[in-house]
Amino acid sequence: MKPHRMTGFATRKANDPHHLDEDGFPFDQVTEDALTFVREHDDRPFFLYYATWLVHTPIHTRSKALLDKYVKKLGVELPDDPRAKWMGEGQTNPFYCAMVEQLDYYIGRLVDHLEQTDDPRWPGHKLIENTYVIFTSDNGGMEGSRTQIITDNHPLDRGKISLMEGGTRVPLIITGPGIAKGVESDVMVNGLDFYPTILSLAGAMRPRDKLFDGCDLAPLLRQDPTNPNLVREADGRVRDTMIWHFPNSAALESTIRIGDYKLVRNYDHLNNPNNRELELYRLYNSEGDRPARMDIEEQKNLADSMPGKARSMNRRLTEALTEMKASYPYYNPHGHRSPDTKTHVCTVLSHRQTGDSVKFTYRENGAEVVRANLIYTLNGGARYEEWYRTPAKIVPGNKAVAKLPKGTTHYFLNLIDENNFLRSYPEILNQKNPSKAQVKY
């Protein structure tokens, strides 16, 4: 909404692209497209992936009435300057609340259509009776940014861009034929399970040449949604383990959940008093008939009192990440909290390009260079540059050589040493447009 989120509210004018409907909600193109798709395909089996923009940033609403409703309900006041920061703590952001209600309304329209529409392939029945609905999210709520507090995932810790429970524990509702109603479950599942589950529920053949990372949840859903023994790996073993790997952005962590316990491995722990290398939490106690909630808030770190448990889970995490050839975060030689070995980072002395071949010469300063990658783009200077990685070869004489892929417009070299420091050449000054580096090619 331009110039700011206190402008551009929807009206009832016919030529308003966001015009209000009979219930006073703004027009939503994604919802209309979803309804159109169902209407055009309800005479045959269909799959609809309804990925709404709500409640993603930017946090705003086209409904002035909803905004006013939540300003009053929350007892807050909008700032005189519409561009001012919104730093009200907790769940007190009226813009976000309005977005949540809009989301509820739009999903309701889709469900209402399924409930009210006859199934052309099943006379006497409605579409909803032959449709599975899965409602979930790709991550926990975004709690805030530098300019505003959006929401609070209390009692869970943190939110989006984190592997703490506030970032990974998300809503999940599954309904459809053969699934018991109103059953709450603490069984551990994730989004990777949806593909094999949908194939199973639809009676579709599983591709023989595909290795599924997720499990088929159909037995769990159809028999007893509270029984974790019904979630099994391809080899028949009960699944009791999941991992999450977020080595970049603000997270810089990996986690593993085994049964009741969750281990958090923080990569940004050296010279950082705010982070422990390992954190261990017992989320549940499954010793009884049903799992009992223990510490999903992740407030009691057991790493010191259960060091053996922490070590064994950390080894298991390493094994899993090694199997999938996971990447890890590197140290920045310019970082003020980087280890002292940053003084041993190599220095790139020169580079030379001949046709599509490029050679870099470097000097080691106490740490061996163990890996090199060429980072390149085919559309340098475009509004949205897309960059790729390809291995460079380390050869005798402290040199790295690589072949430029056809169409390369810009490139740079990454050298990684034995202490996990990364040296880029040339230095990247503009992270949004890496082609604007110190050296032009």
What are these regions (language model features)?
Residues 1-13, 50-52, 56-81, 144-170:
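Core domains of carbohydrate- and sulfate-ester-processing enzymes
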Residues 1-61, 81-97, 180, 276-278:
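Formylglycine-dependent
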Residues 17-24, 86-97, 159-161, 178-188, ...:
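Active-site rim elements
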Residues 27-75, 117, 123-134, 165, ...:
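Active-site regions of oxyanion-processing enzymes, predominantly non-cytosolic
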Residues 31-38, 74-131:
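A long, amphipathic alpha-helix that forms part
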Residues 58-63, 113-179, 189-190, 269:
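Histidine-centered active-site microenvironments of extracellular/periplasmic hydrolases
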Residues 141-163, 180, 187, 192-289, ...:
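C-terminal cap/loop subdomain of S1 sulfatases and analogous C-terminal strand-loop tails that border
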Residues 292-371, 375-379, 391-410, 414-441:
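Long, internal low-complexity/basic segments
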